[in-house]
């Protein structure tokens, strides 16, 4: 899921810089929230992912887009992902790994190979 917020009338999107095994290069930018069913439901006894409450919790408001898709274009049998874009007026402080960017800035990132992951590309395709 992706959180949208306007700063001085300009839409910004909260994205996450992830260091994950298998990433080509150092980091990839991903949606605000990208997690598995097990993470969401704390099946491994961990804590809820950052910003979860904006997508499924008490702060879920103003859903711009919400749609289920097959995982990785149907490559994974019976796996599905939910893409969401929500807009908020809340004052959200970006965590250490998150950053607010404009669509123009995001488009500039898309020009570089392997900087924007497939999940973020999928979510912004609605925009």
Segments from the language model and where they lie:
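Short beta-strand micro-motifs enriched in acidic
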Residues: 5-7
């Amino acid at each position: 899921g992706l959180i949208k917020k306007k700063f001085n009338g300009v839409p910004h999107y909260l994205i996450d810089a992830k260091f994950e095994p298998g990433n080509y290069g150092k980091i990839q930018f991903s949606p605000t929230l990208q997690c598995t069913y097990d993470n969401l439901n704390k099946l491994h006894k961990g804590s809820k992912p950052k910003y979860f409450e904006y997508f499924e919790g008490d702060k879920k408001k103003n859903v711009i887009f919400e749609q289920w898709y097959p995982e990785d274009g149907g490559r994974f049998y019976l796996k599905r992902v939910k893409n969401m874009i929500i807009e908020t007026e809340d004052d959200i402080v970006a965590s250490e790994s998150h950053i607010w960017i404009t669509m123009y800035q995001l488009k500039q990132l898309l020009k570089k190979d392997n900087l924007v992951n497939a999940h973020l590309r999928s979510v912004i395709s609605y925009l």
